[in-house]
């Protein structure tokens, strides 16, 4: 199993939600690879290199990704999926804008707003406005 984590950042530093996403990814078996797309992202790469448990970092440094347009990023991800079995992104405006597009391009179902990773194929998420939790198997 290989997991791809989409890094949310501001072209200078990694945003906090990404660290939560990496923690969730660490509950899955296999390698964790980070995808960092943006413009002039050397400081983001340096910060990412200090994170424990990361096997690889994919860097895409191009002005087209400087504004984090979901249409551009989703094409990048979908066209370079390789052997990844899981793709994770922070449950932020960034991730909620990006991941449905990636899911559609890959013709697969997205599982949104997970609160726990139980195993490689079981995820816990809240339903009914958070008054009930559901486990997808």
Task: Pin down the residues of each PLM region.
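N-terminal glycine-rich FAD/FM-binding segment characteristic of electron-transfer flavoproteins
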Residues: 1-135
